[in-house]
Amino acid sequence: MSSNSGDVRLWGGRFADGPAEALAKLSASVHFDWRLAPYDIAGSRAHARVLHKANLLTDDELDRMLAGLDRLEADVADGTFVGTIADEDVHTALERGLLERLGPDLGGKLRAGRSRNDQVATLFRMYLRDHARVIGGLLADLQDALIGLAEAHPDVAMPGRTHLQHAQPVLFAHHVLAHVQALSRDAERLRQWDERTAVSPYGSGALAGSSLGLDPESVAKDLGFEHGSVANSIDGTASRDFVAEFAFITAMIGVNLSRIAEEVIIWNTKEFSFVTLHDAFSTGSSIMPQKKNPDIAELARGKSGRLIGNLTGLMATLKALPLAYNRDLQEDKEPVFDSCDQLEVLLPAFTGMMATLTVHRERMEELAPAGFSLATDIAEWLVKQGVPFRVAHEVAGECVKVAEGEGIELDGLTDEQFAKISSHLTPEVRGVLNVPGALASRDGRGGTAPSAVAVQLAEVRTDVAAQHAWATAKQKN
């Protein structure tokens, strides 16, 4: 077969004719798996070295093979060489490129002892491991922005909510750090996923391994897989749980971003007026000149659905596949490629939005005690006086009922009204009917007291610094 014929299929010897045009179009994946080309070439280098160790390439052949791969890599990087639909997939395209540079006698030797099945399983892991670190770094950048927001407003009180109703006053910094904690778990999931994925399927062949005396452990080390090669060649080529887990992590990141986004959207309304978005991270309306829209937050909400869809679509594809490799697995890449692409464009914009947010302290603190949010403080004050909590809860509820009927907040009740509600409500109860006191009293670990929040800040700074270090660590590709 001529390397210039445009037909260097990696199969076909037992077929009398080539595939139908409709099949070729259906089968083609080079338009989306071309992004794996650098990893394919790295794998080919490692494979050439084990072929040499097995005496299947001479010293001279290895040198020329590696030089040819270097030239091919450079041509791929600058766009001189690209895959085409006729190539079917990235592996076939790169074999064509190698044959064009080395000729069929030497270039054709690289196929020995490997299959596209173990190739793609390995390259896919390499690609996702690299992008896990990219996403991890972007997450850390967002966490830095949120930590900066908390540090800039350490003593601002706001209404804490459950069911979107006023619940108890909390520090704004405490609220923001709750989101940092959620993102820290996302980052931890990425690190743990990477640890599990650091095993190479290379050497598994189509499913049964190789009879050529090749060394999968050597390839694994060469490609930066810290835990060596897979223990079972069938599992190595057929499993895609690492893809599904990655898709879940990206979907969870999307969900966590959507929760922040929803709050920003609500807080930015005229009715709330808690925050104002920077002009550079807002958009306008084509007809209403007054509009300043939270598009980044809204797109984050929308893209979270897209990320969830990528996960669910992938899981449906993987369902009930028999061992080992099946062509269904061609469909495993686009969902997570898209998830990487979406997060890598969304996270920088989202970080910019949060880093430039203007917080309106007066409005937040105006509403912090509203909605009878200090009722729990009355109940807990009563408990400290020896009143059973069941009774204290009823008494505090009666205080709310009276205040609501009068159209006032709890601190507007008179001493006489308190005494009428319960003899336990002495004038000293007023000592807890203020937001600073309510905040300061919740000083246990994880609480909203300034002292507790300061501890949380110190802990997340350390955690995020470690995340940055992991994200910037280089793989040994």
From Swiss-Prot:
One of its GO terms (biological process) is arginine biosynthetic process via ornithine. It comes from the Bacteria. It is found in: Cytoplasm. The keyword Nucleotide-binding does not apply. PROSITE patterns: FUMARATE_LYASES. Gene3D superfamilies: Fumarase/aspartase (C-terminal domain), Fumarase/aspartase (Central domain), Fumarase/aspartase (N-terminal domain). Pathway: Amino-acid biosynthesis; L-arginine biosynthesis; L-arginine from L-ornithine and carbamoyl phosphate: step 3/3. Transmembrane segments: none annotated. CDD domains: Argininosuccinate_lyase. Its main location: cytoplasm. GO terms for cellular component: cytosol. It catalyses: 2-(N(omega)-L-arginino)succinate = fumarate + L-arginine. GO terms for molecular function: argininosuccinate lyase activity. InterPro entries: Arg_succ_lyase_C, Argininosuccinate_lyase, Fumarase/histidase_N, Fumarate_lyase_CS, Fumarate_lyase_fam, Fumarate_lyase_N, L-Aspartase-like. Keywords: Amino-acid biosynthesis, Arginine biosynthesis, Cytoplasm, Lyase. Disulfide bonds: none annotated. Its EC number is 4.3.2.1. NCBIfam families: argH. Belongs to the lyase 1 family. Argininosuccinate lyase subfamily. This is Argininosuccinate lyase.
